[in-house]
């Protein structure tokens, strides 16, 4: 193996109590760390040099010299302990900086994990956590980022079971920057009446509001009242629980159901903020599938993950749509399954899928095999256009083909499919039967 790509995820804090100031100047705390799907993209590649690490950054701008970056420090520490050759590291930053979401710590931990795999060091999670602890207080959490109760300075971790599967989370990050010094300036260490672990494991999220606190909020909200406003706005939008994450400045809201697009759009426009919406828990779609980013002409400009493309950021990414007709003019449509986050239980274009990073539009056959199990066909490209829904922006490459053989829809990806006559389609348009995207394409190209 010469190259590896990983996806360092962010975390949020569910409750945070500062319990003691230590003689070494650090503070003991207790909190619950919970991973969330927003993630950076980390690529580590051997470069043939005897030693050393180069770092290239994309996405959110990282200030400072490369040699001071915690990723480089992680490489240096691993090289001090083990025999490593030179590597080139590229990090695409999606996790907001100065947000209280652990982006730098995640990058550090995943660098350790990536080097362990790339150089076949066979380190255990415990050994990697020991290395990570020396580089940052909460770095150890990201070696195996599952919900955990954290004590000490954040390095002592105990797994916890949190009832958040199928909840939705909204993350709001303004350009407000909170320094560690100002965050701790107003803190009076104390032992809470009830610790965070007991609260999140014994009560449903809707009952956390009046018992699960972040000690930093009192100080930070006075200095930055906009953050307090955002927290209140999340409750008004229907959140069952809202809080600032860590020492800020990201504010997060948990929802029983997907929040309205109108409420998240207003937060985005009113505060000029990054607003990202995710569903928590294991999903059938691969949240970390790599997708290309493109401009309005379809030219590749970068890359992102599926979760980032679908969380409301409106990052423009390419897809392919294939309309499959039979020789009688009937059109095959697929039924989207109920578990899909976008347009569940609606009929849609026969084949619709993402173009993976590094793939070309012409690799339509892969998506077609996956969805409806046909490969021996030739497709005609009709058009390409930008489609914007309430949740995402897609650069749609439209194809059509004629096919009379058996079609077998994927049981894993679809809820069936069948041919529809022209009259059937026209009589059902506008009645909630089809996806809006299919309706607009059919009317434009085939009506």
What residue ranges belong to the model's regions?
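Nudix hydrolase/Nudix homology domain
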Residues: 345, 383-386, 390-447
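Active-site segment of metal-dependent pyrophosphate-handling enzymes
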Residues: 328, 338, 360-361, 369-406
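Conserved, helical-rich catalytic subdomain that frames metal- and/or nucleotide-binding sites
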Residues: 144-145, 149-241, 256-259, 271, ...
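Glycine/serine-rich anion-binding loops at beta->alpha junctions
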Residues: 90-119, 137, 240-252
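ATP-binding N-lobe of GHMP and related small-molecule kinases
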Residues: 1-99, 117-126, 161-165, 173, ...
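Contiguous, small/hydrophobic- and glycine-enriched helical/loop subdomains that border
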Residues: 108, 112-149
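Acidic, metal-coordinating catalytic segment for phosphate/diphosphate chemistry
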Residues: 286-321, 327
